[in-house]
Design a protein with these regions (language model features):
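Short beta-strand segments enriched in hydrophobic/aromatic residues
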Residues: 85, 128-130, 148-150, 235-237, ...
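Extracellular glycan-recognition surfaces and repeat-rich motifs
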Residues: 25-26, 34-79
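C-terminal cell-surface anchoring/sorting signal
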Residues: 1-22, 272-292
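Terminal, low-complexity interaction segments
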Residues: 180-265
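Extended extracellular/luminal ectodomain segments enriched in beta-structured repeat modules
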Residues: 116-125
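Extracellular ligand-binding interfaces
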Residues: 114, 129-210
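Short carbohydrate-recognition loop motifs
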Residues: 64-103
Length: 292
């Protein structure tokens, strides 16, 4: 009877986990219980911290920047990734990286493996939130970055960098909404600008009068061998003033396979205990029905 009880509990747990596995969204939990994480670094040298073993990292944090999965701005659950930069020199990001290593202990994190060829990327989407207490310029909000190695050879690092998506470059004069969640999608028609990649800052690859209007499709054609080494959502630097907000629900589609991540705060021990009791109760009910 005891072994059967164990098997029923295990089956219940597997059932719950399987429901999450086959769902479209993977939940990444904070390192700490509510109110969650708050990683900060007052130094000018960037530092990072792993979010468990999820492949996500609080990264590039410096000059008082703060980031962490917290309960401040819950979205599709009990949490999201809180972000704050108190000055133009501050920075804070969250990144998904391929088998990342740290530059030191502590240190910043960087990718050592590729995620996929850039040419196979179909789209990326994410949700962001700007608190009305933010004093930075009105068009600023958490940006989306696709991290790349331009020639596809990860042994040469001088061509690493990223493509950046911001609303202001898509829509002209723009004021970011406040105190509400905004979901936006990047696809082949979206305008993106670059940093790094061996071609300088905001390179005008399509030779138009505007250096920020190269589409994702044009970037794919310009770098046919480029590989994706990470996805980034973050703030700064160079944002004069204070920014307070959050990001959540990043999703990318590569060759028809969509990966979505929802960030949540790890349940309190009492919540987990109640969850366990619920599983035990369900298993006990099955046993009683079987005995009857």
């Amino acid at each position: 009877m005891r072994n059967l009880f164990k098997h029923l509990v295990a089956a219940a747990v597997v059932g719950v986990l399987s429901a999450n596995v086959f769902a479209a969204t993977t939940i990444v939990y904070s390192n700490n219980p509510a109110p969650g994480d708050l990683f900060s670094n007052s130094a000018s040298t960037s530092l990072g911290q792993a979010v468990g073993t999820s492949g996500w990292y609080y990264n590039n944090v410096r000059n008082g920047g703060k980031v962490g999965i917290r309960t401040n701005y819950p979205f599709n659950g009990n949490g999201s990734v809180y972000m704050r930069t108190p000055s133009k020199d501050a920075k804070a990001d969250i990144e998904f990286l391929g088998n990342a290593l740290a530059t030191g202990n502590p240190g910043n994190f960087y990718s050592v493996t590729a995620i996929a060829p850039l040419k196979h990327l179909v789209s990326v989407s994410y949700s962001w939130y700007r608190d009305s207490t933010s004093s930075v310029a009105g068009h600023l909000h958490p940006v989306l970055r696709i991290l790349l190695d331009a020639d596809g050879d990860l042994n040469t690092v001088g061509d690493r960098g990223g493509l950046v998506w911001e609303s202001v470059y898509q829509l002209g004069p723009y004021t970011a909404p406040t105190n509400t969640w905004v979901t936006q999608t990047v696809d082949d028609n979206s305008w993106m600008w670059n940093y790094g990649l061996g071609i300088g800052f905001a390179a005008n690859i399509n030779s138009t009068p505007y250096a920020y209007d190269a589409t994702l499709a044009e970037w794919k054609a310009y770098f046919p061998n480029a590989v994706i080494i990470g996805f980034n959502m973050g703030l700064g630097s160079g944002w004069t003033g204070d920014f307070v907000g959050a990001v959540d629900n990043i999703s990318w589609t590569i060759e028809g396979i969509t990966t979505t991540t929802n960030f949540e705060v790890v349940p309190e021990p009492t919540t987990m205990a109640l969850f366990g009791l619920g599983l035990l109760g369900a298993a006990g009910g099955l046993l009683r029905r079987k005995s009857a």
